[in-house]
Structures are given as C-alpha cells and as structure tokens.
C-alpha cells in the first residue's frame, strides 16, 4: 500500500496556479477521484492517490488520518508539490529533509510526526520580488511558461508512476537531472 498526495487548493479560482501543480499532476494520471473525508481519493495499482480539500497549508489534516487508517509507513508516501527553490522546468525527488518554508509540506510533517516521507518537488522558480511569495504561488503561469509547464506535467506523471512501480532510488536517478525548460 502507498499514498501519493498532490498538493493544491480546491476550487476553480486556484486550478491553474503555481501552487496547484501537485493537483495538476494527479489529474494527468487519468484516475477517478471520489470524496472521502477531507479529500478526493482514487485507488489504483494497489495504493491511494489523494487531492486534499483542506487548502494547501492544512494538507496534513487530510493526509495523516488516511495514512494511519491504512497503516501506510512514511517511506511509502509521496507528496507532489511546487517548489520555489527549483527553477521552472526542474523536478526532483527527495526523501525527508526540511520543508524549506513550504507550509503544506510542514503541515504533513507535523501531522505525521516525521519528515521521512518522499517528495516530488516541481520547480516554479522564485518571484521577482522575494517579499511577494504568497502572491506568486497563487498566481497563474504566464503564457510563455505554459510549454515548459506542459513538459513538467508529463514528466511528473511518468515520475509518479515510476515511484509507484520501482521506488525512490531508480526514479531519482532517472528524473532528478532533467532540465525540462529546454524545448
């Protein structure tokens, strides 16, 4: 059993924002999601896929109860989320480590009581004005960024299936060096 969590905010208002890349990746998987608790959940490949309805910064409220109920260990949880510390076009697997200011990841860490879960970090780059980070992550991608976003979503979809079927080490080796910003 495993759990893949796509980070994002519910509602049409946020659907195409940088903060919703995790939701966008899960949408690409072609699964049927149904409401369960504070999330939309799909089942496939012997595991669960979760789109929390709690809003980004409270994701742990949806993740922890499901992980506990199904007795899913942290190393079988993958959180797919946007990452300002990576440029747009880069994706990177990571096991554990600091939330680096990502409040959604911190919420999961606090709710699970551990940092040992895996992450698929999707680069969105830094805002032009560092003091406007919240506004930046809640903004839609610019038109000229959309081709790169499309490549990121396709690669991230493949990366999620890789993690599900093969685990972290081979997938990190395959995806961590990719530069999808180049056409």
From Swiss-Prot:
It catalyses: an N-acyl-L-alpha-aminoacyl-tRNA + H2O = an N-acyl-L-amino acid + a tRNA + H(+). SUPFAM superfamilies: Peptidyl-tRNA hydrolase-like. The keyword RNA-binding applies. The record marks 9 as: Discriminates between blocked and unblocked aminoacyl-tRNA. It is found in: Cytoplasm. The keyword RNA-binding applies. Keywords: Cytoplasm, Hydrolase, RNA-binding, tRNA-binding. GO terms for biological process: protein quality control for misfolded or incompletely synthesized proteins; rescue of stalled ribosome. One of its GO terms (cellular component) is cytoplasm. It holds the Pfam family Pept_tRNA_hydro. The record marks 82 as: Stabilizes the basic form of H active site to accept a proton. Its EC number is 3.1.1.29. Transmembrane segments: none annotated. It comes from the Bacteria. Signal peptide: none annotated. The active site is at residue 19. TRNA binds at residues 14, 55, 57. PROSITE patterns: PEPT_TRNA_HYDROL_1. It is an enzyme of class 3 (hydrolase). Monomer. Hydrolyzes ribosome-free peptidyl-tRNAs (with 1 or more amino acids incorporated), which drop off the ribosome during protein synthesis, or as a result of ribosome stalling. Belongs to the PTH family. This is Peptidyl-tRNA hydrolase. The gene is pth.
